[in-house]
Amino acid sequence: MPVQQAQNTQQNGFAVYVEQRPAGLVGRFVITIHHLVGLLFGGAFAFVHQKKALREANTLEMLLLRFSLIFIWPFMNKQLIRQPFPVQFRQRLEMLGPTYIKLGQILSLREDLLPKAITDELKNLLDRLPAVPFERFQELIETGLNRPVETMFLWIEPTPLGSASLAQTHRAILTTRQVVVIKVLKPGVRQTVTRDIVLLRLVGQILQLFLARYQPARLINEFCRYTLREVDLRFEAENAETFAANFKDEPDVRFPRVYKEFSDHDVLCMEYFRGLTPQANVVNKLSRQQKERLIELGVGATIRMIFRDGFFHADLHPGNLIIFKNRQVGFIDLGMVGRFDTQTRRRMLYYFYSLVMGNPANAARYLTSMALVSHKSDVNSFRRAVEELYQRWLRSSNFDDFSLGRLILESVALAGRYRIEYPGEIILMVKTLITIEGVGHMVAPGIDVRVASRGHIQRIILEQYNLGKMLRDSALLVPELLDLINRSPLALNESLQTLESQLKQSRPDPLQGVRTSILAGFCMVAGAILVAFGSPWPFWAGLFLLAFVFAIKS
């Protein structure tokens, strides 16, 4: 059966995507520099205009700046330059194309680094962009999968489900009758993004020389890592399979099945979720019990992703959450994910647990332990400021306005004042928590997400630290412990030889540093022997801790 053809080249409400040959590296460099210089002078003009409005424009420096702007005025975009600087910034990112739109969307989350006026404006970046014509969309499928569309699909809906900066999606029906979503990269996007990333990394290194406090090179490298994965749709397929495996024991939380036989670098075919988004009016008509069940599933799934798995949806918004008729919840659009290593995930778990249990001092301590600090950082002042912020939240009598996600974001945003930074994954995690909290209030206004989170966090704590799991984790260390037992006599012998050698030397204190070495070796050997004989873990854990302390002291 032939695939249904498009009847409307206007894309039914979408502007038509004008396909152009991607500019080369030199071309993109010229375009990028043009907008960068334009933004620089636009910022200077906005600064002068602001000072003039405040009657502060009569200083010598301001007069010189105004005089210099006269010479470049004929070359400026008059309509754009008269806008406030945050608006200029957003519009120039949109002009530069998909890479910079994605960059702006990431920067909109960095309230810890950028002024609020800029982050608020960047939240207005376009998310409904021109769509590739339907005939061209089918050609891209055939090129990507190297076979005619009619051999794979009975029908493809001409109207796009969505058209973003990098890709476009349509609903379709496979020849095997399953309803699916086809996601296709827009033509030229990968080449443009790859060239832009080369230039962005160069710009990041240059900005690092002048704005080292804001770590532009690190921020841009983080962004480049995320974006390169988004222009290879195989990564999104892997993400969907990882999420499904992590939640295989939770049938009420669903992730779309990927049809790998119809997927490649540029094409992704996945299960279509027929359901409602949280904004739908039908959701408001559900009973209180049904709403609480949905919130329980959504909040529980999000907390589980972050604090148990360390692998979470990093582009969550209400449109990416699906509510099914049988009151299950589904997550879609899985191209952007965040990952925590074991140590960070554990600290995040302790931090969040302290928050929901109302322990500001511990929460501030664990939040500080995850920060990126330098010799210029004022860690103690930051910790005190965070603790005071938590105390104010806890004293608040109006818990209807209590936003746990906003509290975390405000805490992280304080870091910039004290020369402290946080990894991008933590900012993405905060955005995910804010989104799921907002969805909770959308479905059931007035819900206290802190209370809803408490049971899930306590469950994860119990799972992570029950005796059986600790014994299994300890068993993984058996080879290292056996090796330690074998090497301990030699280490002890070497320590004694060192002691004998130092005793023969004429020193004011020949035993300095050696006593602790012997004690460290003794504790290590004793702990290893206790492990070998199956003694309870508190006994050998304490000995290993003492060995570590003595070793550091020596």
Where do the language-model regions lie?
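Alpha-helical transmembrane segments
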Residues: 526-529, 546-554
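Glycine-rich ATP phosphate-binding loop
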Residues: 171, 178-186
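N-terminal accessory/targeting segments that precede structured cores
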Residues: 1-168, 194-216, 550-551
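ATP-dependent phospho-/nucleotidyl transfer catalytic cores
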Residues: 116, 123-130, 142-147, 190-195, ...
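Hydrophobic residue at the +6 position relative to the catalytic HRD Asp in the kinase catalytic loop
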Residues: 319-323
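Hydrophobic core segments of alpha-helical transmembrane domains in multi-pass membrane proteins
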Residues: 538-548
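Helix-rich C-lobe and terminal helical cap/extension of kinase-like folds
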Residues: 11-25, 46-60, 83, 264, ...
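Conserved beta3 strand of the Hanks-type protein kinase catalytic N-lobe
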Residues: 172-173, 316
